[in-house]
A protein has these predicted regions:
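Cysteine-dependent deubiquitinase/ubiquitin-like isopeptidase catalytic cores across multiple families
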Residues: 1-141
Length: 141
């Protein structure tokens, strides 16, 4: 399994990458209050609330992997998936945050955050924050 960056979702672009197990989009996060009702994931869908700051890319990739039955997860991730199978999304998120394996893998790829002055940190207006969101087929849809 590997990740490809796409600039288009047309048939030609999708055909170049081979089988697609899921899509991960990068959105600008606006921080607006969302009054929509929370949707409960269907049975068999791995969905975890993000409990770790700055781990949305790791969580998006994990969501694709955990929801694709044709991908061999390996012994540790298969055990993790079975262990968290019946957990609600918030508890799955806590399980991710408490997993030594996932922490090690995330930290091996994560970039160090540059040091930010307190004045810059206080002025949030100029900061743009982005968030990764994954989409996966469920039951062939």
């Amino acid at each position: 399994v590997q990740v490809h960056e796409l600039w288009s979702l047309d048939k030609e672009s999708m055909a170049e990458v081979g089988p697609v197990h899921g899509l991960i989009f990068l959105f600008r996060w606006r921080g607006e209050k969302d009054d929509r009702a929370t949707v409960t994931p269907g049975p068999g869908v791995f969905f975890a609330s993000q409990m770790i700051p700055n781990a949305c890319a790791t969580q998006a990739i994990l969501s694709v992997l955990m929801n694709c039955p044709s991908i061999s997860l390996g012994e540790e991730m298969t055990a993790f998936k079975a262990f968290t199978k019946d957990f609600p999304p918030d508890v799955k998120g806590l399980a991710i945050s408490n997993s030594d394996l996932l922490r090690r893998v995330h930290n091996s790829f994560a970039r160090a955050e540059p040091t930010v002055s307190e004045e810059r940190r206080a002025s949030k207006e100029e900061d743009e924050v982005y968030h990764f969101i994954s989409y996966v087929p469920v039951d062939g849809k």
